Structure formats: C-alpha cells, structure tokens
C-alpha cells in the first residue's frame, strides 16, 4: 500500500463521516417533517447523500478509479446544493459548510494523484 492508497482510505472514511453527519442532521432537524429554513426537500437530499456517501466509501476501497470519480461528483453536488440552497452564514458562522468545502477542496486537489498512483484494492480479485 503506497501513500496514495493510504490517503484514499483516509478519504473514504471522510465519506463515512459525511454519511453519519447527514443522518445526524436529519434527526436533529426534524427527520421527514422538517420545516426549517432549508427547502422542504432537504431531508430527502440528506438521506440520498447518506447512501451515496456509503457507496463512495465502498468504491474508493474496492474500485479506486470509480471511487475517485464518484467522490468528485458527490462533492460537486454537495457543495453546489449547500452553498446555493441552504442557509449559509445567515444564522452565524457556519463551521459545517466550511468543513465540507475544505473536504471538497482536498478531494479536488488530490484527484489527479489518486487517479494515477492508487494501486491497492480491498479485494485482490476486484
């Protein structure tokens, strides 16, 4: 396992953290009956992103290139939705959005390296 593979595993666990965060957000803000400042479809977006995050986690470990593409696509989607549809800094300093943005920047900056240098896979048969 080289440095790119180790970093890819770390990145994969970042998506698990994201999935757990999305579940926490949905529970804390009303689950299916959320009427907060975000759009009414927000809970369904979070549930969907939660599942996608887990798929990205698995693909980063099992099929590195598929995982890298999915991680970039997921971060582009999550950042666009979060920066345009949800209250950003209206209710104070939004550390969650800044953390998500930082994670997205890390994904974007490391994608070329991970694409070319990742070799290790979870299963040698994959």
What are these regions (language model features)?
Residues 1-126:
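Topology signature of small-to-medium multi-pass alpha-helical membrane proteins
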């Amino acid at each position: 396992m080289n440095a790119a593979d180790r970093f890819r595993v770390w990145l994969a666990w970042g998506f698990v953290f994201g999935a757990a965060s999305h579940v926490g957000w949905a529970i804390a803000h009303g689950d299916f009956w959320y009427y907060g400042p975000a759009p009414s479809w927000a809970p369904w977006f979070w549930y969907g992103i939660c599942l996608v995050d887990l798929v990205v986690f698995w693909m980063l470990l099992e099929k590195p290139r598929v995982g890298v593409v999915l991680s970039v696509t997921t971060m582009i989607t999550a950042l666009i939705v979060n920066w345009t549809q949800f209250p950003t800094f209206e209710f104070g300093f939004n550390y969650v959005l800044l953390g998500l943005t930082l994670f997205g920047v890390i994904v974007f900056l490391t994608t070329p390296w991970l694409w070319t240098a990742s070799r290790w896979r979870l299963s040698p048969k994959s």
